[in-house]
C-alpha cells in the first residue's frame, strides 16, 4: 500500500510539474497561491485524473494514520462513523465542491434507468453466494493468522451483541453510501476521463481493496470492486453500485448475526441456505445457479438508454 501511494503521489506531482503555467511564475519558482488559483480557475465538471488519484491517496493515508489515534475505549459505532464519514466521504465531497464545477456530477449522482435499478437489486442477491465462495477460497489459500483471528473474534463479539438493524445501518448502508460515492463516484469519475474506462475500473477497485485492513478482505474487496466498477460504468452513476454493495454487506452481516445468535434457518430459505459448524452458508446447487443468474443480469446492464449513453460519453470526454 505504501509503495502504491508513493507511485501515485509521484505520478500526480509529475503531472503538475509538466504544466509550466501552473507551477512557475516569472521568477521560475513554484508558488502555492498561483497553483491553488489554477486549480480553482480551471475546474472541470468532473475531477481531473490526477486529482482523483490524490483523493484516493489521501483516503489511504488517512486510514493508515487513524489507527494510531483511535482510542481503544471508543465504541465501534463512533469509530465506524468517523472512518466512513470523516476519512472516506469527507475528502471526496470537499474536493468535489472545491475542485469541480458540479459536485453532483463529480460524485456521479445521476438519474438511473429503472431496468438498471431492478437488475442491481437482483444482482445484489444473486452475486452474494459467489462472493461467499470467493471469501472462503481466499482464506484457504491465505489462512488468517492467529492474532488477526483473535482480533476478528473480539470485534464480532462486540458487533453482534447489537440489534440487527443497528448493524445493518452502520456496517451495510453507511459504508455502501460513503465508499461508493468516493470510489465509484469521485475517484471513478475522474479516472474515467480521456477514455480511461479500464484505468477507472482497475485503479478504483485496488484503492477500494486497500482500504480494508485485513489481507483476505482486501483481496475479496478488490475483486468485488472490479464488478462494482463495471456496474458503475455501464449504469452511468453510483446509485446501482450502492444498491449492490449494500445488499452484499447486508446479507453477509445478517447470516453471520443469525448464526452467532444460534437462530435456525427459516423453512422458507431451506432450499438455498443451510446451517453448519461455520455458520449459515449457501447450498452448492444455489451457488452454481447464482453464477448463471449474475451473468444474465449483468447483460441487462449493457442495455443503455440514450440518456445514460449521453451521460457516460460526456464523462469519458
Question: What is each model feature region?
Answer:
Residues 73-80, 104-178, 193:
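Juxtamembrane helix-loop-helix connectors linking adjacent transmembrane helices
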Amino acid at each position: 500500500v505504501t509503495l502504491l501511494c508513493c507511485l501515485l503521489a509521484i505520478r500526480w506531482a509529475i503531472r503538475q510539474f509538466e504544466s509550466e503555467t501552473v507551477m512557475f511564475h516569472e521568477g521560475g519558482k513554484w508558488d502555492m497561491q498561483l497553483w491553488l488559483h489554477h486549480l480553482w480557475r480551471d475546474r472541470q465538471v468532473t475531477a481531473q485524473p490526477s486529482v482523483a488519484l490524490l483523493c484516493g491517496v489521501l483516503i489511504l493515508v488517512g486510514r493508515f494514520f487513524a489507527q494510531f489515534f483511535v482510542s481503544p475505549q471508543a465504541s465501534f459505532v463512533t469509530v465506524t462513523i468517523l472512518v466512513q464519514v470523516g476519512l472516506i466521504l469527507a475528502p471526496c465531497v470537499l474536493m468535489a465542491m472545491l475542485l469541480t464545477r458540479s459536485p453532483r456530477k463529480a460524485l456521479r449522482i445521476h438519474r438511473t434507468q429503472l431496468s438498471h435499478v431492478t437488475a442491481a437489486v437482483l444482482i445484489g442477491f444473486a452475486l452474494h453466494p459467489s462472493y461467499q465462495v470467493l471469501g472462503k477460497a481466499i482464506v484457504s489459500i491465505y489462512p488468517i493468522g492467529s492474532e488477526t483471528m483473535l482480533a476478528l473474534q473480539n470485534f464480532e463479539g462486540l458487533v453482534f451483541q447489537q440489534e440487527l438493524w443497528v448493524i445493518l445501518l452502520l456496517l451495510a448502508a453507511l459504508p455502501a453510501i460513503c465508499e461508493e460515492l468516493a470510489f465509484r463516484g469521485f475517484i471513478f469519475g475522474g479516472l474515467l476521463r480521456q477514455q480511461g474506462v479500464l484505468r477507472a475500473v482497475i485503479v478504483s477497485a485496488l484503492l477500494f481493496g486497500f482500504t480494508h485492513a485485513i489481507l483476505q478482505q482486501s483481496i475479496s474487496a478488490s475483486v468485488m470492486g472490479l464488478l462494482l466498477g463495471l456496474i458503475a460504468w455501464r449504469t452511468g452513476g453510483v446509485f446501482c453500485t450502492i444498491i449492490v454493495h449494500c445488499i452484499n454487506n447486508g446479507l453477509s452481516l445478517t447470516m453471520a448475526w443469525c448464526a452467532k445468535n444460534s437462530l435456525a434457518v427459516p423453512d422458507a430459505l431451506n432450499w438455498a441456505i443451510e446451517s453448519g459448524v461455520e455458520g449459515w452458508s449457501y447450498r452448492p446447487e444455489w451457488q452454481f445457479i447464482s453464477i448463471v443468474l449474475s451473468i444474465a443480469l449483468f447483460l441487462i446492464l449493457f442495455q443503455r438508454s440514450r440518456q445514460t449513453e449521453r451521460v457516460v460519453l460526456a464523462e469519458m470526454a
